[in-house]
Swiss-Prot record:
LRR repeat intervals: 53-78, 97-119, 120-141, 142-164, 166-188, 190-212, 224-248, 264-287, 339-362, 661-683, 684-705, 706-727, 729-748, 749-772, 776-802, 806-833, 876-898, 899-920, 921-942, 943-965, 967-991, 993-1010, 1013-1037, 1082-1105, 1106-1128, 1129-1151, 1191-1214, 1215-1237, 1238-1260, 1262-1283, 1284-1307, 1309-1335
Modified residues (Phosphotyrosine): Y525
Gene name for this UniProt entry: Lrrc9
Disulfide feature: none
Annotated transmembrane regions: none
The name this protein goes by in its record: Leucine-rich repeat-containing protein 9
Family annotation (InterPro entries): Leu-rich_rpt (IPR001611), Leu-rich_rpt_4 (IPR025875), Leu-rich_rpt_typical-subtyp (IPR003591), LRR_dom_sf (IPR032675), SDS22/Internalin_LRR (IPR050836), U2A'_phosphoprotein32A_C (IPR003603)
Keyword annotations from UniProtKB, A to Z: Leucine-rich repeat, Phosphoprotein, Repeat
PROSITE patterns: LRR
GO cellular component: cytoplasm
Region described as Disordered: spans on this chain: 305-325
C-alpha cells in the first residue's frame, strides 16, 4: 500500500515537472531555483512534492480533483496561492505560509472561513463561488486589501469587516444581503474604493433590487471610485447622492417633528382637561384653608386673651370670671373640632387631586405609548430610504375597513367575559410595506405553487390573515416589533420554548392572542399591589396581522414536539382551540386555531392594529374610565362623579360653630394699623403678626418690628417678598395663597425655620432654590406645593439636595434614602472631568448615517471616551462631541478647554442661560431643547454653527443681531417658545430649515422678514397666532415665500402655488408697505408710491392708520378698479396711469340678457353695435348720479393709458370734489358722465377717439378752466357753449378742416389760450387771423403769444379785403336786382368757383347757374355786415384773402 502511494506520488511529481518544464530526474537540483509552479485541469489529484521547491513563491492549481489543502508546510516563502475550481471543503494547512500575500480559493466547496489567523501579510483573498454563509475569521488580516466573497450564501455583513481597515476592493455579489442597514457597516472601511454587490457575472443581491440602492451606497461610502463595475468617481455623482440623502433627512426630520407636535397637542389637551377637573378641588381646598387660617388666628387670639386675663385678674374677681373662662374653653374646643373637620375635608379634596393626577399620568403614558411607534417607523423609513414604508389608514381606505372587520370578526365576547370586556374598538391601523420581505414572500410562494398541484381549488385558500402571538411575559416592545417589521420573523422571536424558535406562532382568534397577556398583567399588578388605574393598561393592545401561506398543513399530534423534524413533509401545523382551552361556553371555539409555520419567509407582516377594549365600569370614582379619557368639563362633578353628599358635607362643615364674622380687609399697612393688630405700643414687643385674609401687596413700616418671630401674610395680594428682608429674627413665615412670582429680594432671614410658599406663582426652579439656599440657612420646614414650577419632576430632589437643613418638604418627612438620592442627583448637576469623559467622543467626522438624531448623540453612542482617556496628554482638545442630555444641569461650565468641540447637546436640563460656550469656536451643531432659557446669547463667536435647536424653552424674542455672524447656519429650530417676532432672521441667508411652531407670531409682517431667505425650503409655523389671524394663511405664506417646498409638515403642491398666486398675486397690503418701510407706523405716512409691481388689488387695513396719506402713485400696475383706495379718507392726488381701470368700484359681470352686439359695444364702443341700447342700459344700470359720493378729498386724478372706453361705467360722477382729471391715452369716444364734477377745473382727454361732443357732454354750466383734446378725431366743435369759464383749450392734432368749426369757439368768451396746430385747417394760414378777430380775449395761439401788432395786422388785413370782396360780389351780381334796404342790399345766394391755388389769387370763373346757399361763415366783423349772416366763402376764395394779406405784409416790411 505504501509502495503504491509512493508510486502515485512519483507519477504526480513527474506530471508536475512535465507541466512546468522541469526534469524529474534532477528536480532536486532544479527545485531550489524554481519560484513558480502551475497545474491546470488534471494530473494533480493531491498536493505533493512541494518539499522539493524550498523557494517557491507562487503556486497555481486550477480544476484539479483536490479535496484538501495539505503539503504546504515547507513552502515558507510562498506569497501567492491559487487552488481554484477544485473540491476543497475546508480551509486548512496554511498555518506555515506566513508570507502569503495572495490567496485564491474560488470555485470550491468551502462553507466556513477559518484557519487564516496567522496569515497577517495576506492582501488578496478570493473565496468566491463557495458555500460560505458567514463572514468570519478575518480579524487578524489587518493588511487585507482585496476580498472576493461573490457567489456565496452570505446574508449579513455585520461588524466582521471592521478590523480590515486597509480593505480597498470588496466583491459580495451573488449573496443574500437584503438590508440597507447592513451595508452601513462598510462605512468603517475608509479606504474602500471598489465595491461590487451586483457584478454582472453573478446574481445580484436582493438589496440591489431596492429603490435608491446606488444613492444609499454612494452617500455612506463617499470614497468609492467604482460601484458594481461602474465608474462613480465623478464629483457630480457624489454631490447628487449627498443632495438626495440630505433632502431625505430634512424631509423625515420634518415628519418626525410633526409627529412630536401632534403628541404635544394631545398632551396639552389632556393637561387642559386635568386643569378643568382640578379647578373644583382647588377651589374647595382654598376655601377650607382660608377658613382654617381664620380659625387658627381666632384661636391664637383667644389663647392670648385668656392668658392675659388670668395674669391680670385679682384673686377676689377670679371666681366671677370662672364662667367666662369656661365659655372660652368651650369656644376653643369648638374651634378645634371645626379645625379637625376642615382638615378632613382638605384631605378629602387633596385625595381627589391626587386621583386626577394619577389618571392624568396614566393617560399621558398611554398617549406616549400610542405615538411611541410613529417616530421609530419614520426613522426606519429613512434608514431604508423608503423601501420600508408605513402608512396610517383612514376610513377612506378599503384596507383600513377590512382590518377593522377582521378584528371584529375574530372577537368573541364570551372569551373576554371574565375580564369585564364587552367589546373592542380599533383606534389605528398602520400598513407595513416592506419591499424586500414581500419579494421574498412572493418568490417562496411562487415556488410552492410550482411544486404543488395548482389545479386544486382549495390550495389558494391556504393564504390566510393571522395574528402573531407575542410572548405574554414580554410586552410588545418597540425594538422587537421593529425587528419583525424590518427583517421578518426569522431570528426575531425571543420566546423561550424551542418550538417557537423554529416555527412562527400565529392564531386566528383575538382571545387566543390577548388572554395570556391580560392574565399576566393582572397577576403582575396584583403582586406589585398596583392601584386600579395601573391595571387599566391592558385595555389598550397592539396586534400584528400577517399574511400567511399555510401550504400543506396537518393537525398537531398529542405529546409530540412541534418541529420540522417531526413534521418533515408539511409547511405548517395547527392546534384547535379545544385542545388548548377545553372549557368553552360557545361554539366559536371550534373555529379557533393556533398555527405553527416552519418557513419564516412565508409569513409576511402587513398590518399593525392598535385597539381598545370597552369594559363594564365596576369601580365608581372621581373619573369615569369607561371612555378611557379624562372628562372635559368640571361641571361633570355635579352630575354624580362627585357625589352630592360630599358637597353638602362641605357646606355643613363650613356652617359648624363657631362661625367667625369676616373682618374688614386691609389695603395698606401703617404704624397705626400694626399697633392695633398687635395690641401693644412697643414695637420690640411684637413677636407675632397675623395679616391673613387681607388685600395687602406691600409690607411697609415693618422695619421697626425687630423682634418679630412669626408672620402670617397668607391670602393677600403679594407678588414679591422684598419687604421682609430686614426681619432678622423671623422664624415662621406663611406666605401661602398669594401671587408671588419671584423670591428676588428675599434675603437675610438666617433664623427662618418654617416657610410656606404654597399656592403662589413661582416658576424658576434654579433661581428660587439659590435664593433660599443663600438666605435661609436654618430652614427646617418648606412648603412649595401648587406652584407652576418649570421642572416639577426633579423639583423635590433639587430642593432636598440644595437645602441640607430641611426635615420636611411639602408636608412630608424627608427620609435618609431621599437625602442620599438628592445628594447623588446634585452631584450630577455639574460638569466635571468625569462627566466629560463619560459623555463625549473624539471622532473627527460625523458618521454618514441616515438619521435625524443630533450628531452628539450619534457619536457618543458609537464611540465614547474611556475612563482612562484623561491619562493621555491634552485630552480636552481631542473632544469633538459632547452629549449631556438629561443630566439636570443648572449651568454650563468647564468647557473652556474644549477648543475643538464640534457637536454638543444639552437637552432636558435646567439651564436658564446660554453661557460657557464662548470658547467653543468650532461648534457646528448645538442642541438645547427642553431647558428654561429665555434669551439667545453668547453665540456671536460661534461662526461655524450650522444647526441650532432650542425647542421647549422660554424664549420671548430674538435679539436683532443675534444671527448676523452665523454665516453657515442651515437649520434653526425654536419650537414651543414665546417668540413674537422674526425680524432677527432677516440676514440668515443660508437658512434651509426653520422650525418655529407653537410660538406667539401673530402678524403678517413676520412672514416678510423671511422673504430674503432664498435658500429656505422647509418652514414650520404651526400653532402660531398668525394661522388664525390670517385668512388663507397657508396660501399667503406660499405666495410670499415661493422657494418653500414644505410648510407646517406638509409638502407644497404645484396646485397650491397656483392658487396662492391667484389669491395674493398683485395685492398691495399693509404688510407689504411695512416690509419696505421697515416698520408698521403708517400714521406718519403722507405719500404712497408703489409703481410697476403688478398690483391688482389694494387692501390697506386698518384704514385709519393711513389717514394722513394724501398722495398715491400706483402707476404701471394691473388695477381694474380703485379697490381699497376708496377707503383712504384724505387722498388728494391719485395717479393710476398705465393700469386697466374699468370702474371706480369693481365691475359687475356682464348680464346674460345682453345681446352679443351690445356686449361688443361695451368692449369696443367704436364698433357702433348696440350703441343706443347699451348706452341706455348703462345709464339705467349704473345711475352714478344717484350713487353716494366717495373719496371727497380727492382733487387730482390721473387715469391715463388705462384702455378706458366708457366714462359712464367709470362712475367719475361720484368724485364730487375732483379738480383735475387726466384721461389721456385711452379709447374714449364720448365725453360723458362728468356732469356732477362741478368743481372740475382741468380735463385732459388727449390721445383718445373723440369725434364730436353729444348733447350731454357739457350740458351743465361748468367751472372748467382748461380742456385738453389733442390727438383725437374731432371734426366739429359744437355744443361747447356751457364752458363759460374755459380759459385754455388744446385742440392740436385733430381733424378739423373747416374754418366754420373754429367760428363756434366764439361762444367761449373767456378763452385765453388755444392750440389748433396739427389740424388740416392749419395748412391755411388765414385761420390765425380769423381766430384773432373772432376771439378778442385770446392771448396765445398755438403756443405763440398774441400781441397788439398781431391784432392790428389782422384788422388791417380784413379791412383791406373789404373793398376787394365788395367789388367781386358786385361784379357777380345778376342784372335784375331785388329790392334791398337802403343801407344794404341783401346778397343773393352764390358760390365762388375755386382758384387753382389757395395762396394764388388767380382769375375767377363765372358763377354757376344754380348757386348753393352757404351759411355759418366766419369772417371779420367789418366784412360780414356787407354779406349778411348766411354768406359763406369757399376755401378757394379764402386763398384770395390769404394772398392779399401776404402781399400787404410784404409791402409793409419793405417800407419799414
Amino acid at each position: 500500500m505504501i509502495e503504491s502511494e509512493n508510486l502515485n506520488r512519483g507519477e504526480i511529481i513527474k506530471e508536475l515537472c512535465l507541466c512546468n518544464g522541469l526534469t524529474y530526474e534532477i528536480v532536486g537540483q532544479e527545485g531550489s531555483d524554481t519560484s513558480k509552479l502551475e497545474m491546470f485541469f488534471s494530473g494533480y489529484p493531491r498536493i505533493v512534492g512541494l518539499s522539493l521547491f524550498h523557494n517557491l513563491s507562487s503556486l497555481t492549481i486550477v480544476a484539479q480533483d483536490i479535496r484538501e489543502i495539505s503539503g504546504l508546510e515547507t513552502c515558507l516563502q510562498l506569497k501567492e496561492l491559487w487552488i481554484a475550481e477544485c473540491c476543497i471543503e475546508k480551509i486548512e494547512g496554511l498555518q506555515g505560509c506566513r508570507n502569503l500575500e495572495k490567496l485564491y480559493l474560488y470555485y470550491n466547496k468551502i462553507s466556513k472561513i477559518e484557519n487564516l489567523e496567522k496569515l497577517i501579510k495576506l492582501e488578496v483573498l478570493w473565496l468566491n463561488h463557495n458555500m460560505i454563509k458567514n463572514i468570519e475569521g478575518l480579524q487578524t488580516l489587518k493588511n487585507l486589501k482585496d476580498l472576493n466573497l461573490a457567489g456565496n450564501l452570505v446574508s449579513s455583513i455585520g461588524r466582521c469587516l471592521d478590523p480590515n481597515e486597509q480593505l480597498e476592493k470588496l466583491n459580495l455579489s451573488g449573496n443574500q444581503i437584503t438590508s440597507f442597514k447592513d451595508l452601513t457597516n462598510l462605512t468603517k472601511l475608509t479606504r474602500l474604493k471598489d465595491l461590487c454587490l451586483n457584478d454582472p457575472q453573478y446574481k445580484s443581491n436582493p438589496v440591489c433590487q431596492l429603490c435608491n440602492y446606488s444613492t444609499h451606497v454612494l452617500y455612506h461610502l463617499p470614497s468609492l471610485q467604482r460601484l458594481d463595475t461602474f465608474d462613480v468617481s465623478a464629483k457630480q455623482i457624489k454631490e447628487l447622492a449627498d443632495s438626495t440623502a440630505m433632502k431625505k433627512i430634512m424631509y423625515y426630520n420634518m415628519r418626525i417633528k410633526t409627529v412630536q407636535r401632534h403628541l404635544n397637542e394631545e398632551l396639552e389637551k389632556l393637561n387642559d382637561r386635568k386643569c378643568k377637573l382640578q379647578k373644583l378641588p382647588e377651589e374647595r381646598i382654598k376655601l377650607f384653608n382660608f377658613a382654617k387660617k381664620t380659625l387658627e388666628r381666632e384661636l391664637a387670639e383667644l389663647k392670648i386673651s385668656s392668658k392675659g386675663q388670668s395674669d391680670t385678674t385679682p384673686e377676689a374677681e377670679k371666681p366671677r370670671n370662672s364662667e367666662v373662662v369656661t365659655q372660652e374653653s368651650v369656644l376653643q374646643q369648638k374651634i378645634l373640632t371645626k379645625l379637625s373637620a376642615l382638615d378632613d375635608r382638605v384631605t378629602f379634596w387633596n385625595k381627589k387631586l391626587h386621583e386626577i393626577e394619577a389618571i392624568y399620568r396614566t393617560e399621558v403614558k398611554q398617549k406616549k405609548k400610542t405615538h411611541g411607534l410613529l417616530t421609530p417607523f419614520l426613522l426606519t423609513e429613512l434608514e431604508t430610504v423608503g423601501n420600508i414604508h408605513f402608512e396610517e389608514g383612514t376610513q377612506a381606505d378599503d384596507w383600513f375597513n377590512s382590518c377593522c372587520e377582521l378584528i371584529l370578526s375574530r372577537f368573541c365576547t364570551w372569551d373576554f367575559r371574565a375580564y369585564g370586556i364587552t367589546g373592542v374598538k380599533v383606534k389605528r391601523v398602520i400598513k407595513v410595506n416592506n419591499r424586500i420581505l414581500r419579494l421574498k414572500f412572493e418568490e417562496k410562494f411562487q415556488k410552492c405553487l410550482d411544486l404543488e398541484d395548482t389545479q386544486d381549488p382549495d390550495y389558494r385558500k391556504m393564504l390566510e390573515c393571522l395574528f402573531y402571538v407575542f410572548d405574554p411575559e414580554v410586552t410588545v416592545k418597540k425594538k422587537h416589533l421593529l425587528q419583525i417589521l424590518e427583517r421578518g420573523f426569522k431570528d426575531s422571536d425571543t420566546s423561550k420554548p424551542s418550538l417557537k424558535k423554529e416555527a412562527v406562532t400565529l392564531v386566528n382568534s383575538l382571545s387566543m392572542c390577548e388572554c395570556p397577556r391580560i392574565e399576566f398583567l393582572q397577576q403582575k399588578y396584583k403582586e406589585e399591589k398596583k392601584g386600579p388605574s395601573e391595571s387599566e393598561l391592558y385595555r389598550h393592545g397592539t396586534i400584528l396581522i400577517a399574511k400567511v401561506f399555510l401550504g400543506q398543513s396537518i393537525q398537531a399530534r398529542d405529546q409530540e414536539p412541534i418541529n420540522k423534524a417531526n413534521y418533515p413533509m408539511v409547511n405548517s401545523v395547527f392546534v384547535p382551540q379545544r385542545h388548548v382551552l377545553r372549557q368553552r361556553t360557545c361554539d366559536c371555539g371550534y373555529r379557533q386555531y393556533k398555527w405553527f409555520v416552519f418557513d419564516h419567509d412565508l409569513v409576511l407582516p402587513e398590518y399593525i392594529v392598535e385597539f381598545e377594549y370597552t369594559t363594564v365600569v365596576k369601580v365608581h370614582s372621581l373619573f369615569s374610565t369607561s371612555n378611557n379619557v379624562i372628562l372635559e368639563e368640571g361641571k361633570k362633578y355635579s352630575e354624580g362623579l362627585v357625589f352630592s353628599q360630599d358637597l353638602k358635607f362641605d357646606d355643613e362643615v363650613l356652617k359648624m360653630e363657631p362661625r367667625i364674622k369676616p373682618r374688614p380687609k386691609l389695603i395698606s399697612l401703617d404704624e397705626k394699623t400694626i399697633i392695633s393688630l398687635a395690641k401693644t405700643n412697643i414695637y420690640s414687643h411684637i413677636v407675632n403678626l397675623n395679616l391673613h385674609g387681607n388685600s395687602l401687596s406691600k409690607l411697609r413700616d415693618l422695619a421697626k418690628l425687630t423682634g418679630l418671630r412669626k408672620l402670617n401674610i397668607s391670602f393677600n395680594e403679594f407678588t414679591c417678598l422684598d419687604d421682609v428682608y430686614h426681619l432678622y429674627n423671623l422664624e415662621y413665615l406663611d406666605a401661602s395663597h398669594n401671587h408671588v412670582i419671584t423670591l428676588e429680594g428675599f434675603r437675610g432671614l438666617m433664623k427662618l425655620k418654617h416657610l410656606d410658599l404654597s399656592w403662589n406663582q413661582l416658576k424658576k426652579t434654579g433661581e428660587e432654590i439659590n435664593v433660599l439656599c443663600k438666605h435661609t440657612t436654618s430652614l427646617l420646614t418648606l412648603d412649595i406645593q401648587h406652584n407652576p414650577w418649570q421642572k416639577p419632576a426633579t423639583l423635590r430632589l433639587s430642593v432636598i439636595g440644595r437645602l441640607k437643613t430641611l426635615t420636611h418638604l411639602d408636608g412630608l418627612v424627608i427620609s435618609e434614602e431621599e437625602t442620599r438620592a438628592a445628594l447623588k442627583f446634585i452631584s450630577g448637576t455639574k460638569i466635571t472631568q468625569l462627566t466629560l469623559l463619560q459623555h463625549s467622543s473624539s471622532k473627527e467626522e460625523r458618521p454618514r448615517m441616515l438619521s435625524t438624531w443630533p450628531s452628539a448623540k450619534i457619536l457618543t453612542q458609537i464611540s465614547k471616551l474611556g475612563p482612562h482617556f484623561h491619562l493621555t496628554g491634552n485630552w480636552y482638545s481631542k473632544i469633538t462631541a459632547l452629549n449631556l442630555d438629561g443630566q439636570h444641569l443648572f449651568e454650563i461650565t468647564n468647557l473652556e478647554k474644549l477648543e475643538n468641540l464640534k457637536w454638543a447637546s444639552f437637552s432636558n436640563n435646567n439651564l436658564s442661560k446660554m453661557e460657557g460656550l464662548e470658547s467653543c469656536v468650532n461648534l457646528e451643531e448645538l442642541t438645547l431643547d427642553g431647558n428654561c432659557i429665555s434669551k439667545i446669547e453668547g453665540i456671536t463667536r460661534l461662526t461655524k454653527l450650522s444647526r441650532l435647536s432650542m425647542n421647549n424653552n422660554l424664549l420671548t424674542g430674538l435679539e436683532k443681531h443675534t444671527f448676523d455672524n452665523l454665516l453657515h447656519l442651515h437649520s434653526l429650530s425654536l419650537e414651543n417658545n414665546r417668540i413674537t417676532s422674526l425680524s432677527a432672521l432677516q440676514k440668515t441667508f443660508t437658512l434651509i430649515e426653520l422650525y418655529i411652531s407653537n410660538n406667539y407670531i401673530a402678524v403678517n409682517q413676520e412672514i416678510y422678514n423671511l422673504k430674503g431667505l432664498c435658500n429656505l425650503v422647509i418652514l414650520d409655523m404651526y400653532g402660531n397666532i398668525i394661522i388664525w389671524n390670517q385668512e388663507n394663511y397657508r396660501f399667503f405664506v406660499i405666495f410670499h415665500l415661493p422657494e418653500l417646498k414644505a410648510l407646517d409638515g406638509v409638502s407644497i403642491e404645484t396646485s397650491e402655488t397656483e392658487t396662492a398666486k391667484d389669491l395674493f398675486g398683485g395685492r398691495l397690503t399693509s404688510d407689504m408697505i411695512a416690509e419696505r418701510q421697515g416698520h408698521s407706523n403708517f400714521i406718519q405716512m403722507q405719500e404712497l408710491n408703489w409703481t410697476s409691481s403688478a398690483i391688482r388689488t389694494v387692501d390697506l387695513i386698518p384704514v385709519d392708520h393711513f389717514r394722513n396719506v394724501s398722495n398715491v402713485n400706483l402707476q404701471n400696475n394691473n388695477l381694474t378698479s380703485f379697490s381699497g383706495l376708496i377707503y383712504l379718507p384724505n387722498v388728494k392726488v391719485l395717479c393710476l396711469n398705465y393700469n386697466h381701470i374699468e370702474s371706480i368700484m369693481p365691475r359687475l359681470k356682464p348680464q346674460t340678457h345682453l345681446s352679443s352686439r351690445q356686449l361688443l359695444y361695451q368692449k369696443v364702443p367704436s364698433s357702433g353695435y348696440g350703441q343706443q341700447g347699451t348706452s341706455k342700459l348703462n345709464r339705467d344700470s349704473v345711475g352714478s348720479e344717484n350713487l353716494p359720493p366717495i373719496m371727497q378729498s380727492l382733487e387730482v386724478l390721473h387715469l391715463g393709458y388705462n384702455g378706458i372706453c366708457n366714462l359712464v361705467q367709470l362712475q367719475l360722477n361720484r368724485l364730487r370734489n375732483l379738480k383735475f382729471l387726466f384721461l389721456q391715452g385711452n379709447e374714449i369716444s364720448q365725453v360723458e358722465g362728468l356732469d356732477n364734477l362741478i368743481v372740475l377745473q382741468e380735463l385732459v382727454v388727449d390721445h383718445n377717439r373723440i369725434r364730436a361732443f353729444n348733447d350731454t357732454a357739457f350740458s351743465k354750466p361748468s367751472s372748467l378752466l382748461m380742456l385738453h383734446l389733442e390727438e383725437n378725431r374731432l371734426r366739429e366743435l359744437s355744443k361747447l357753449q356751457s364752458l363759460v369759464k374755459l380759459e385754455k383749450l388744446f385742440l392740436g392734432y385733430n381733424k378739423i378742416q373747416d374754418i366754420t368749426e373754429l367760428e363756434k369757439l366764439d361762444v367761449i368768451p373767456s378763452l385765453r389760450e388755444l392750440t389748433v396746430y396739427g389740424n388740416p385747417i392749419c395748412r391755411k394760414m388765414v385761420h390765425r387771423h380769423v381766430l384773432i378777430f373772432r376771439l378778442p380775449n385770446l392771448q396765445m395761439l398755438d403756443g405763440i403769444p398774441i400781441n397788439s401788432d398781431d391784432r392790428a395786422k389782422a384788422e388791417f388785413h380784413f379791412s383791406e379785403l373789404q373793398a376787394k370782396k365788395s367789388s367781386i360780389i358786385q361784379n357777380n351780381l345778376p342784372t335784375s336786382k331785388s329790392s334791398l334796404p337802403s343801407h344794404l342790399q341783401t346778397p343773393l345766394p352764390c358760390k365762388f368757383v375755386p382758384v387753382t391755388n389757395s395762396t394764388d389769387g388767380g382769375s375767377f370763373c363765372h358763377v354757376k347757374a344754380s348757386p348753393i346757399k352757404i351759411t355759418n361763415v366766419l369772417l371779420p366783423a367789418g366784412f360780414s355786415r356787407f354779406l349778411g349772416p348766411d354768406f359763406t366763402l369757399t376755401p378757394e376764395v379764402e386763398g384770395i384773402f390769404t394772398k392779399s394779406f401776404r402781399e400787404n405784409e410784404k409791402t409793409n416790411k419793405q417800407q419799414q
